[in-house]
């Protein structure tokens, strides 16, 4: 049995259209609530969200579903995804819910679920919940005297702020550092600038005025132009860009040059190795990470384990094999000594600690290896047609041709997005011209096949 609703990062879609409707959210609340009402204690679910307008559609629907099966609901308001995971654990909740579509535009929304341990649910849990949504929900409603209750946690943001500061080494401060932080008009718009300011930095906030529509719009980790411009204009030491739910981060140095997740994993992995903190003898990355990262770590006697794309798969390998550093090139950085999921702010704080301790500028500290030329392009196709397009004879022929040209000189990766109707085409190799030509040829063929 395969999941139909749940993708690689929960349920996602265009808000107020199937499946991302209030009706679905209420059914999800009932089914997930029933699945996690084990034991005879009072059952609790915490719900956080980002700043999308449609959060007001989904939050009350989920709340109604949970209350109807006897679960108490604690509403956290706008908070980063890792904060929801943290509070699920610290409040001894049975379940955590984050309403967010991460880096997607405001029209989309999504729902991620966390178990009582703060980790994302297993495939098996998601399958069980999905099956329950299709049948048998009437029987799980409780009587009116056993309905759950809802309350808002007023100090939720403050709890996460204290936790984030706790991950920064004691005795260090950010005095004298000027930092631009782009919060994507998203979930971290209050907490990220506050954490940096409380640690002593001069903070230049960008995209901290959410209006329900501007999340990720020309800002955040996918649109870094403003952050880079502000870093150069203000003479800042570092730029930090988060995405809409702040579970991913990218940086730029004082010159405005970008630092992606691969460079961050190289830095943290190397530093933690030298300090004896690194576990597993290396890091866990995905198939999208640059070969330059692997070569850099190999030179230091460290291994690189690769997984399918998606932070859930990275985390699965980390937990199974005992690693404590992992992530994605896109900026999902998982530091399991601190978090149960990707945490952009906490990852950024580890980099800032390294900068303070070294006394070097970011341009010297954060570019540890030269990446091989890599080109990634996305092709949007009609929903539900990805497999059909990839199976088209012309597309298969274009892929075979590119593979033949890159043989021995690079690699090619074609995959469908787990969260959007996109086909991602990536090539990497020593010859930049060949890499770009290979990707362009496949992208053009996919576009023709998609009509």
UniProtKB/Swiss-Prot annotation:
Modifications after synthesis and translation: Activated by phosphorylation.
The protein, known as: Phosphoglucosamine mutase
Cofactor: how bound: Binds 1 Mg(2+) ion per subunit.
Lineage of producing organism: Bacteria, Pseudomonadati, Pseudomonadota, Alphaproteobacteria, Rhodospirillales
Matching PROSITE patterns: PGM_PMM (PS00710)
Any one Gene Ontology BP term: UDP-N-acetylglucosamine biosynthetic process
Any matching Pfam family: PGM_PMM_II
Enzyme nomenclature, EC number: 5.4.2.10
Keywords noted in UniProt: Isomerase, Magnesium, Metal-binding, Phosphoprotein
Keyword Phosphoprotein: yes
Gene3D superfamilies, sorted: Alpha-D-Glucose-1,6-Bisphosphate, subunit A, domain 3, Alpha-D-phosphohexomutase, C-terminal domain
List of catalytic residues: 102
